[in-house]
Amino acid sequence: MRLTGPWKLWLWMSIFLLPASTSVTVRDKTEESCPILRIEGHQLTYDNINKLEVSGFDLGDSFSLRRAFCESDKTCFKLGSALLIRDTIKIFPKGLPEEYSVAAMFRVRRNAKKERWFLWQVLNQQNIPQISIVVDGGKKVVEFMFQATEGDVLNYIFRNRELRPLFDRQWHKLGISIQSQVISLYMDCNLIARRQTDEKDTVDFHGRTVIATRASDGKPVDIELHQLKIYCSANLIAQETCCEISDTKCPEQDGFGNIASSWVTAHASKMSSYLPAKQELKDQCQCIPNKGEAGLPGAPGSPGQKGHKGEPGENGLHGAPGFPGQKGEQGFEGSKGETGEKGEQGEKGDPALAGLNGENGLKGDLGPHGPPGPKGEKGDTGPPGPPALPGSLGIQGPQGPPGKEGQRGRRGKTGPPGKPGPPGPPGPPGIQGIHQTLGGYYNKDNKGNDEHEAGGLKGDKGETGLPGFPGSVGPKGQKGEPGEPFTKGEKGDRGEPGVIGSQGVKGEPGDPGPPGLIGSPGLKGQQGSAGSMGPRGPPGDVGLPGEHGIPGKQGIKGEKGDPGGIIGPPGLPGPKGEAGPPGKSLPGEPGLDGNPGAPGPRGPKGERGLPGVHGSPGDIGPQGIGIPGRTGAQGPAGEPGIQGPRGLPGLPGTPGTPGNDGVPGRDGKPGLPGPPGDPIALPLLGDIGALLKNFCGNCQASVPGLKSNKGEEGGAGEPGKYDSMARKGDIGPRGPPGIPGREGPKGSKGERGYPGIPGEKGDEGLQGIPGIPGAPGPTGPPGLMGRTGHPGPTGAKGEKGSDGPPGKPGPPGPPGIPFNERNGMSSLYKIKGGVNVPSYPGPPGPPGPKGDPGPVGEPGAMGLPGLEGFPGVKGDRGPAGPPGIAGMSGKPGAPGPPGVPGEPGERGPVGDIGFPGPEGPSGKPGINGKDGIPGAQGIMGKPGDRGPKGERGDQGIPGDRGSQGERGKPGLTGMKGAIGPMGPPGNKGSMGSPGHQGPPGSPGIPGIPADAVSFEEIKKYINQEVLRIFEERMAVFLSQLKLPAAMLAAQAYGRPGPPGKDGLPGPPGDPGPQGYRGQKGERGEPGIGLPGSPGLPGTSALGLPGSPGAPGPQGPPGPSGRCNPEDCLYPVSHAHQRTGGN
């Protein structure tokens, strides 16, 4: 079998690292058996603890208990009334480590102040306790019981004065640290006591686990439980804080986010009383005076265990409107229009009145991809393009003839630095580099290939390698001595450096590195092939004004655009627009000639002129001599030359390609209203609420919209016309990725790189927190008139209509069927008098005449409450509510894309005075007026309809014990119980009457000789009798125990099976000799009927067994002998009572 790289690495680590340690520590078992536990705020101190690595079990979540607010700032588990018993294997699927700690935070209520209850208990398959934490309110003690290796149950009782506040009906924290031979008890973050223990037995995790249960009847105890956790470390309980139960609350901050120093001084001593020993105040319950800046994102947490399915939540309040959505996908590129000819310069218009700033128009959709336009003139040199993948080297062309020397141009502006490109193909060897010593990896005497005399330059920085495979789990450390809690160790010395790991697999390409230092110039290389055209650069500086071009032809009128989409958020106010066209009013009277003005300042630089005509090609130079040289590196920039004389203006060039979109101009005056556009064809969505109810019964009303699919790509355009003039083409499409090059040597760390390319649009994030209502935006322009909408949802129920005309009196109907008396409503449906004759309802008669109003009857007695109905079907969506109060101003929207600047048109004639325009858009909401005078008292309204059923309230506080109820009706036949107790010996019955004389039998077969007795059958019969007596005595004792173990034992039996069928009677046999006493018959079938009333007291002096008395003093050990069931059942009676404390 061939081993791959990762397997070789694993095998190497297994051989060399595994022998280092052969012991198995608790830490490995902890990592294997305990999940990661969620820790809240200041629950643990941060000394030597990484909150992401705390492991353990939250028993409240494991028992699927619901949380509810028991105070304004605290939540508690709802214990309910069901038994809090679960299979242990479901709570601890992989068991518990040898050392662990239990942390609980609770408040004892009044009813449980003196009760004895189990905080946590683990039972084995025989329902015998293995681990128990008992809180006894009557004795004011805490007990910890566990099973030792010898099989005895050891009981450690903590009876300390410091434990008395645990029962004062206030919040307290109780913690127990269980180590191999030490038990420590903590209360309110203080160490109360510590006990040495015997070695504990292994725990059987195939039984049951109980929490917060009364010892008397196994029902949940009346406490408020905030926390019940098991940490998979015995030392974590010492790191618990008591910030939740401390009465030190952080004060209100002043306007500057500070806390008064007097408050800190006054509460420092009070807070220190809640801190554990040897711990400083600065580590505990600090009040943060001001919120700091957001930290860096934390490391991703490991995935948690799948939680239980939660119950459907109640309908939340309507959220505030969300933020504007992300920018939609870019539409198809618009068609490229023909270049219009430049019009003549218009005459200077009369000064117009400053128009009002118009509202920003709606952003139009991008048009479909148009055919390619005519080829434009060569544009200015653009900035360096994005890094291209290395293309294949072209064939070396012949050297061209030297051209005529052109005029020296002006020095251009320094372009922005280009983005770093990928590593190019290996270049030719450079000049001799400086030798450097690189440790023991490279030798300065190493030589290159024979054909290259000089050493190469330092290569570009190599790509970052992939992360190596994770190493195998290290050897297990030996178990350390149990440390003293609270002692903070000093910082250890720095460890020895680890062994250098094996080289990882080649990584994925890393991010482009920063630009390296400028290298020394290389040898002059051969002239390379012409590179591809870079992307279009930004507009260059404005050139000198060119001559007026020939007037262009009138362009073709574009098609009418589609109506805009949904009105977007109002954009930012645009820059001040240019002066609008002359007003439509009549020209005013000519004014008087003004005085000549002072000479104005120098005007701005004119626009760039049109490009000149291509120069004539130069003469062909002589053929060069020599071998083509290598491609040289780019030389240093030359000094700026002397500015040459200004050239003659060139001839008008051909029209250029349209430039980039200009900056949006200032808003002009509002135009006249256009003709009504085509209505938008909206898809028929129908009633969303009704559609949702067909799929789910508990959906929210809002539904995300469907995402449009991307349209198909347009077909190829028509082939272009052949152009005889060979000009440099536009930049071509990006070529396919080249073959990955070999991994270069690791380069030095470069400088900080330039900002990267903006990333792609990410996935849609979760719905954010509703923001503060924005200020009212400016009123948008009136939209186009749409088509008539679809019929709206059904309106609200109208008011009651007027009474219809009275109908004719109908014939009397037959008597109805008597109504059965059920649900306490019989008095409403009884038919009085006569015999109830069954009949069927007749056809409905016409409405009778309206009778006179009868006298007001006496108020009826309050009826019994009806049964709780089933939840109704979700109703249709109600009508829209009244418009809400105007919100605050929203954030300014993103500026719209700049429009294409239009060509200046010819000046038109002055028009006549137009008709009054349409009514303008509604103005912004005015300032709220003062409250008006209160109106007169209105007429008393009609009583409203009955409101909907309220939400279910939280569980109330248990009330006082009620009075003794009446005797209940006999219940249904219960399940088969455990074997009943053996009753006391009954009185000897009277002699029965002799039976009827039977028919004489035929002579029997001679019997077996008397001396051939089967001792095996006698032995079997004795064993059966002894077993029967033992089971009956055992059942008596179990029925008298009021413990969860006794309750669980009763649940272990199944239901009785159906009685078997009677067999056919056999033929009468011959009477044989008198046989031995028969065996015990099978248990008879259960009797039919309700249990009988208690019988009269028996005449025997022996009464029924009494309830167990209080445990007496321990007696001397008795002699070994037979086992009494009362002594063998529950080992707790032989537990070693080990008390401690004061």
UniProtKB/Swiss-Prot annotation:
Its main location: secreted. GO terms for cellular component: collagen trimer; collagen-containing extracellular matrix; endoplasmic reticulum lumen; extracellular matrix; extracellular region; extracellular space. Keywords: Cell adhesion, Collagen, Developmental protein, Differentiation, Disulfide bond, Extracellular matrix, Hydroxylation, Myogenesis, Repeat, Secreted, Signal. Residues 370-429 are annotated as: Triple-helical region 2 (COL2). Localized to vascular, neuronal, mesenchymal, and some epithelial basement membrane zones in umbilical cord. Prolines at the third position of the tripeptide repeating unit (G-X-Y) are hydroxylated in some or all of the chains. This is Collagen alpha-1(XIX) chain.
